[in-house]
């Protein structure tokens, strides 16, 4: 933290009162926060020691005056009506303190606000505890609402402070965010980055940071008495202030000197405006060194709405929403705001009510049960009654409404940009090819399709407006080629990079190949390899030893560790291209936050997955491609729309979804194959209902009845139930049925004959075996000769309803000369399918998540060039993206995915450009099983075009939403 920032709230004193403190050279902020030893002018210590350091308000008209014993006569002259008014006010706020204590505080401060801040710092922890004890008293209502709320919040603050002291280290990220939000609620007019810096300067001590800010803004008008006090004291202190300014030590910060000079020239300026001015200066200084800030001028040239105008727009309707603790009573709420609160309480959904601070689900349900709220009187009657609801909830509505206003304002700004773009984009789409030509640096032997040229022109148009975008063409329409053509166009125009292309691991080789094939002029660097290899690569990149235009890397390596992330923060990129951009739909994910730090002027997202009707995901994508627009408001967006309501969405949510989709229209280009590829052969889908074998059916029924008896309140447990049923529906060997406990006991004893296990404990061996499936135990028996006699018979391995149908289907397809791509969710299922294919004497190749990257492109080429290979086995997640297998014309989905769009991606490995035959998609569904229910739910989701992608989920992961739907379907 720069000393420029630290000096902002550092205690300073004129030469008459010395402060003995170490120079702020070290980073130990604990030492800075310790009490400063003070001496009077004669060198003696004062008798009354202060428990905390008093902070000076350099921007206010009143200076802090410490009075010693030898100035007692002067003190008597100052005890007048103003001081009595101050004591009365302080007694109202701190009734548990004696008049003597409060008088001492007033003597040590010159303003009422300064005295309040001083009391909060000294007595805050004591007061909060006392206030909690008084919560049940009826006379508590006699206290001002403002003060009660402050005391209650101080309680939680003291708990946070205590926990930090115990840890004696920087708090966790979650705790930091919580403290930041709490401070933001107290001071909504100050930017978060400024508040974060101040918290850091105070070692994340909330109370000290708040006290510093309160003292700094002590001239904020909170009461008429304070105004009178200011007017009376201004003249008496003006001369003293001038003297102190001239005597200020030269070692004070430039910011402090500037503020002091400014306050002397403009005595009437309010402290909040001074604070805003200082905040602006501080923001400018910190933003210069911040690698996370985007270049606003480069990123958003169309955004001609100034930040100050935006703030005025937000504040015009919601000035009274600003969480001002000085107006925490019902009389202070304006008529317009009352109407908005009534409307919110009347229309908000359960989840939206739960966003109110202190509003639990039970309270939200209570509010809904008390509807309708037609007038402000209705609200006051219900929230003042002794029915478990507090008037604080009504004031909490103001915060939620303000956050809504932030979102509305952001979307309004985006809409202005969208309107300017829509006309140009429409002209490009309607004009068709026109004068659009393929870049000359592209391979002359390869030609772009007409719709690909339109996509290229659209990308060029975005670039001319200095905007980012999302190319969302359906899978198989050549998004990769369009992106390469665009980078080639930039190369022709003299923009030679560097660019970054981030892709899934399975498509890395394909991207490198397509770049070399379509545009050999581009110099491509593959950022890949071990930690040591990447270390030397980074050095060569940063020192300029390697000449390149494009870096191609994977998601895992781009943000793999601190050094990888540091490289792409330091490297000034022109374009960052993200393949499979739907991975960036959640702004709360760690991957999203890391990728946001990549230092690129523009971003281009490629995705074949349609956008979900989920506002958080839409806003996440908007935020990613236009970070300068959203950087300061992501927390409000995330909070407002991260919850998924089980009930019908509110009208506010629906309206924002409609608005977001309208805004995103010019930034997203999506075409489907049926529209642009008239010559592409059709795709036929066939669902094969496979009756389970007799043994499999019995085992499934036993498992279903057992799972149905178990408690299913926990959604995670419910997801596990679904997974167990899915595994049994696919193959019995995915569970442990045939290897009984007695058989495992015999096997564990036999294992002692192995040289590797001669001194092992049979009980521990058996314990390890009990968690394995039948097929895993079968493979174990094949590995160790001592237990080879326990192997399963081949008839048991092939005993599956799907295998019976698959045997017949493969024979027919092979006879017709068709070639097959077979997908499964489970790699273990692929292991069992391999045994079936060997048994049926079918040639095959296999690719899954464990296949080394270097071998993947070779396997794809081997299958595409060798027609003798009949089947390509693929795991749905690893092989379902970015792979071209147009040489096959039949797709078999052995087991369907929870997300139907993953299956659609898998199907499009064959149904894509270059396909000359009708593509047949066969889905194998176990009859009367969990898969039957999954199919119905998936079909409904496809109709709604709602993608159920789980962020960084494991293979076969089931979303909670899917689990709930299946729970109803199965009657669990």
Curated annotation (Swiss-Prot):
Residues 22-42, 63-72, 128-138, 237-246 have a biased composition (Basic and acidic residues). PROSITE patterns: CUE, HELICASE_ATP_BIND_1, HELICASE_CTER. Residues 805-966 form the Helicase C-terminal domain. CDD domains: CUE, DEXHc_SMARCAD1, SF2_C_SNF. Residues 460-628 form the Helicase ATP-binding domain. DNA helicase that possesses intrinsic ATP-dependent nucleosome-remodeling activity and is both required for DNA repair and heterochromatin organization. Promotes DNA end resection of double-strand breaks (DSBs) following DNA damage: probably acts by weakening histone DNA interactions in nucleosomes flanking DSBs. Required for the restoration of heterochromatin organization after replication. This is SWI/SNF-related matrix-associated actin-dependent regulator of chromatin subfamily A containing DEAD/H box 1A. It comes from Danio rerio (Zebrafish). The lineage of its organism: Eukaryota, Metazoa, Chordata, Craniata, Vertebrata.
